[in-house]
Design a protein with these regions (language model features):
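Soluble-to-membrane junctions at the N-terminal ends of transmembrane alpha-helices
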Residues: 74-93, 144-167, 321-354, 374, ...
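Transmembrane helix-loop-helix hairpins at the membrane interface
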Residues: 82-229, 340
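Flexible metal-binding regulatory segments at protein termini and peripheral loops
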Residues: 1-122, 212, 237, 318, ...
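Membrane-embedded alpha-helical bundles of multi-pass transporters
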Residues: 106-118, 150, 169, 400, ...
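Conserved ATP-binding TGD loop and adjacent catalytic N/P-domain core of P-type ATPases
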Residues: 18, 330, 499-503, 534-536, ...
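Juxtamembrane coupling segments of multi-pass membrane pumps/enzymes
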Residues: 5, 192-256, 287, 337, ...
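Conserved cytosolic catalytic loops of P-type ATPases
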Residues: 28-46, 54, 189-191, 220-314, ...
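ATP-driven catalytic headpiece of P-type ATPases
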Residues: 85, 297, 418-464, 494-575, ...
Length: 732
C-alpha cells in the first residue's frame, strides 16, 4: 500500500469534498481516501500492485476535479494568480452590467443609446454580450457543476450552474422576443442576475481562499524556517553551500546568530539554542558534544560543528509539516456528520427549487417570477458554510497546537481530547525527569564493584531505558571501559538478557524477570531499605544467581503537582501506571497528588488495565514511548513525549515536542475551544439555510418581501464569510 497527498483543484463546497471522497473510496485498488476542503487535498492510500499514481489522478478527473499532483504549490500559486485577474475582469464587467440595467432605478445618468425604453434592442444585446463574457470568466463553475451533475454528485457549483443558465437562457429567449418586436420583454431580462451571481460567488471564493491561506500559516512558517545556505567543511576548507548540497555525514559549522541548517549531532563546541518553534519552550536549551540539533533552530552563543544526520524530507521540520498536514487530512467524527448531511442537502435543494418553480408557475402564471424564485433557491442554498465549518477550525487548531510544541496526528484526537474521563501516566520519564542517578549498589558477587559495574554498563549500553542510561553515565563518570557482548536481548517490560564473551549470562531488570527465570532473592531486607528510600530497583543475576541490587532515584518534573491538580479540577480521573514497585510508585504518587496507583505492571498488563478503564469513558495514556507503545495504541488517545528529533512515533496520536506535561492541559483547552467553534460554525450554517431557503421559496411574497438571485448570491457569500471569520477567532 502507498499513501499520497494530492492537491485538488475545483472543490468549492462540502458536497464537492464528500462527493469526491465517496467516488474515490468506491474505486478498486483504493483502500482509503480522505478529502479536505480547506487544504484542497486528498489523502489517498492505494494498492501499488493494482494502480499507478496516474490512474489515481484519472479517478480524480473522472469525478469532475483536477489533480495538481503531490504538494504542487507552484501550480496552486499560478492558479491563484489567474483567479485574481479573472476576478478583476468579472468585477469591471459586472459593475458595467449593473450600471446599464439599474442606473434608471437609482437616479444615475442613463447611457442614451443603451436606454431600455428608447433602445431596447441595444439594451438587450449589450447585456447579452457582457453577461456572456462574465459566464466565460466563470466557466470553471459551470464546468464543475455539469461534471458533478453527470457523476450524480451534485454540489454547490451544480446549483449555481443550473440557476445561472436558467436566468441566462430565459434572458436569451426574452432577447429573441425583443428582436421580434415584443419590447415588453425588456423588463423580463435576468442577465444581471446571472452575471452578479457569478460575481458574488467569485468574490466570496477569493476572500475565502485568502482566509483559508491564513489558516495554513503555521505550516507555511515551518516550511520556510530553515536557512537557504550553510557553511560546511569540504577537503579541509570551509565552503558555503545550499541546503540541497548538504549530504549525510557532512560537518556543518554554525556561528552565533545563525540557524541550524539540517538535523545533526554536535561534535565540537558548546552553546545555547532556541528551539521554541519545535518545542514551544522559549528558554534556550544548552547544547554540547553529543547533543542533537534541529534544523531551523537559532544558535545563540558559541560556534559549533555538527554532523549532518537528517536532510531534506527526513528532517524534523519536514516530519512535523507532514504530520500536521496529515492531521488536517483526517476527518473528525463531527465532520463526518456534516459531510453526511451535505450529501443529501444538494439533491433536496434541487427538488425544493423544482417544486417551487412549478407551484409559482401555476399560481402566478408568471414564468419570470417562477424562474426568479427557482434561481434564488438554488443560489441561496449553496452549502459552502456547511463544508467550511469543521475543516477550517481543525486546520487552525492543529497549527496553534504545533506552535506550542504539540503535534496532533489525527482530527479525532483533537476533537476527543477534552472529553477524556481518565488520563494514565507512566512514571519514569513522564512524571519524573528521567535523569536517573544511582544512589546505592548492593554487591553480592565475588567481583569488585568496579568490575561488576563494567559488565552491567556494557550490557545496559545497548538499552534505551532511562535506568540503563543512569548505569552507563555512572560508568562513564568512573572512567570505565565497556566490554563487547556475545549476545544481547531486550525483554519488553522486564529488562534485558545478555551473554558476555566468557559465556557468563546476565539478567538485568525488575523482580518479575528474576521470578520468571527462577532466580532466588534472599536479600529482602536490602530490597526493602531501597524501597523505603524511594528508589527504583534494578535486580542483577549472574548465571541465575542474584549478584546485585541497584537503587536508582529520579527527580520529579517541575510544576507536576499543579498539572495533576488542574486535571483533577476538571473532574478527570488521574492514574499512575508503572512497572515500578508499589512502595516507590506510592511515594511518588503521594508527592504529586495522584490517588490511584497501579504498580508492577508489564506493558501487556498496562494495556489490559487501560481496556478496563475505557469502559467508563475516553482514556488518554501518556508515556515516553520506550516501553509504552502497546498501551499508547490501546488507549483512545496516546500521548508520547518526544526527544525533539524522534517524532515518527506511530503508536501515539499526540506528540509533545518537549517533556513539559503542562502541554496536556493546554491541549485540553485547545480541544475544548475548537469543538465549541465548530458547533458555532455548524449552527450558523444550518440557521442561515433554515431562514433563507423559505424566504427564497417566496413565503413572504404576500407581504411584499421577495428575494432575487443577486440578493441570494450576496447572502450566500456573507454566510460563508461569517463561518470563516468565526473560525479565524481560534488564532487569537
Amino acid at each position: 500500500m502507498k499513501k499520497v497527498l494530492l492537491k485538488i483543484d475545483g472543490m468549492t463546497c462540502s458536497a464537492c469534498s464528500s462527493g469526491l471522497e465517496k467516488y474515490l473510496n468506491k474505486q478498486d485498488g483504493i483502500k482509503t481516501a480522505v478529502v479536505n476542503l480547506v487544504m484542497n487535498n486528498a489523502n489517498i492510500e492505494y494498492d501499488e500492485k493494482k494502480l499507478t499514481l496516474e490512474q489515481v489522478e484519472k479517478f480524480v478527473e473522472k469525478a469532475g476535479f483536477t489533480s495538481l499532483g503531490i504538494d504542487n504549490f507552484e501550480k496552486e500559486e499560478k492558479k491563484k494568480s489567474n483567479e485574481k485577474y479573472k476576478l478583476i475582469g468579472i468585477s469591471v464587467i459586472s459593475i458595467l452590467i449593473l450600471y446599464i440595467s439599474m442606473s434608471h432605478m437609482v437616479g444615475l445618468p442613463v447611457i442614451p443609446f443603451l436606454n431600455m425604453i428608447t433602445h431596447p434592442i441595444n439594451y438587450a444585446i449589450s447585456l447579452l454580450i457582457l453577461t456572456t463574457i462574465v459566464i466565460l470568466f466563470g466557466k470553471d463553475i459551470i464546468k464543475n457543476g455539469y461534471k458533478n451533475l453527470i457523476h450524480k454528485t451534485p454540489n454547490m457549483d451544480t446549483l449555481v450552474m443550473i440557476g445561472v443558465l436558467a436566468s441566462y437562457v430565459y434572458s436569451i429567449y426574452g432577447t429573441i422576443r425583443i428582436l421580434q418586436g415584443h419590447t415588453m420583454y425588456v423588463e423580463k431580462l435576468y442577465y444581471e442576475s446571472a452575471a452578479i451571481v457569478i460575481f458574488f460567488i467569485k468574490i466570496g471564493k477569493f476572500v475565502e481562499s485568502k482566509n483559508k491561506d491564513k489558516t495554513k500559516e503555521a505550516l507555511q512558517e515551518l516550511m520556510t524556517i530553515t536557512p537557504n545556505n550553510a557553511t560546511i567543511i569540504r577537503e579541509g576548507k570551509e565552503v558555503v553551500v545550499t541546503l540541497d548540497e548538504i549530504q549525510k555525514g557532512d560537518i556543518v559549522i554554525c556561528k552565533p546568530g545563525e540557524k541550524i541548517a539540517v538535523d545533526g549531532e554536535i561534535i565540537d563546541g558548546v552553546t545555547h539554542i532556541n528551539e521554541a518553534f519545535i518545542t514551544g519552550e522559549s528558554k534556550p536549551a544548552k547544547k554540547e558534544i553529543g547533543s542533537k540539533v534541529i534544523a531551523g533552530s537559532i544558535n545563540y552563543e558559541g560556534t559549533i560543528k555538527y554532523k549532518a544526520e537528517k536532510i531534506g524530507k527526513e528532517s524534523t521540520v519536514s516530519e512535523i509539516v507532514r504530520l500536521v498536514a496529515n492531521a488536517t487530512a483526517t476527518k473528525a467524527p463531527i465532520a463526518k456528520i456534516a459531510d453526511k448531511i451535505s450529501g443529501y442537502f444538494v439533491p433536496v435543494v434541487l427538488v425544493i427549487s423544482i417544486i417551487s418553480f412549478v407551484l409559482w408557475l401555476i399560481i402566478s402564471k408568471d414564468i419570470a417570477l417562477a424562474i426568479n424564485i427557482f434561481v434564488s433557491i438554488l443560489v441561496v442554498a449553496c452549502p459552502c458554510s456547511l463544508g467550511l465549518a469543521t475543516p477550517l477550525a481543525i486546520v487552525i487548531a492543529s497549527g496553534n497546537a504545533s506552535r506550542k510544541g504539540i503535534l496532533v496526528k489525527t482530527s479525532e484526537a483533537l476533537e476527543n481530547f477534552h472529553k477524556a474521563k481518565t488520563i494514565c501516566f507512566d512514571k519514569t520519564g513522564t512524571l519524573t525527569k528521567g535523569t536517573l542517578s544511582i544512589s546505592k549498589i548492593y554487591n553480592y558477587s565475588n567481583l569488585e564493584e568496579k568490575e561488576l559495574l563494567k559488565n552491567i554498563a556494557s550490557i545496559e549500553k545497548k538499552s534505551e531505558h532511562p535506568i540503563a542510561r543512569a548505569i552507563v553515565n555512572k560508568a562513564i563518570e568512573e572512567k570505565i571501559e565497556f566490554e563487547d557482548l556475545k549476545e544481547f536481548k531486550a525483554i519488553a517490560g522486564f529488562g534485558v538478557e545478555a551473554i558476555m564473551k566468557n559465556d557468563d549470562k546476565y539478567l538485568i531488570g525488575n523482580r518479575k524477570l528474576m521470578t520468571e527465570n527462577g532466580v532466588i532473592i534472599p536479600n529482602e531486607q536490602d530490597e526493602q531499605q531501597l524501597v523505603n528510600d524511594g528508589n527504583s530497583i534494578l535486580f542483577v543475576s549472574l548465571n541465575n544467581k542474584l549478584v546485585a541490587l541497584i537503587g536508582v532515584k529520579d527527580i520529579l518534573k517541575d510544576n507536576i503537582e499543579n498539572v495533576i491538580k488542574e486535571l483533577k479540577d476538571k473532574n478527570i480521573n488521574v492514574v499512575m501506571l508503572t512497572g515500578d514497585n508499589e512502595k516507590t510508585a506510592e511515594i511518588v504518587a503521594k508527592q504529586i497528588g495522584i490517588e490511584k496507583v497501579i504498580p508492577n505492571v508489564t506493558p501487556k498488563e498496562k494495556a489490559e488495565k487501560i481496556k478496563e478503564l475505557k469502559k467508563d469513558g475516553i482514556v488518554i495514556m501518556c508515556g515516553d514511548g520506550i516501553n509504552d507503545s502497546i498501551s499508547l495504541v490501546t488507549a483512545d488517545i496516546g500521548v508520547s513525549i518526544s526527544s525533539g528529533t524522534d517524532i515518527a512515533m506511530d503508536s501515539a496520536s499526540v506528540i509533545l515536542m518537549n517533556d513539559n506535561i503542562e502541554k496536556i492541559n493546554e491541549l485540553i483547552e485547545i480541544s475544548e475551544k475548537t469543538i465549541k467553534n465548530i458547533k458555532q460554525n455548524l449552527f450558523w450554517a444550518f440557521f442561515y439555510n433554515i431562514c433563507m431557503i423559505p424566504i427564497a421559496c417566496g413565503i413572504l411574497e404576500n407581504i411584499g418581501i421577495e428575494m432575487n438571485p443577486m440578493v441570494a448570491a450576496f447572502a450566500m457569500t456573507i454566510s460563508s464569510l461569517t463561518v470563516v471569520l468565526n473560525a479565524l477567532r481560534l488564532k487569537k
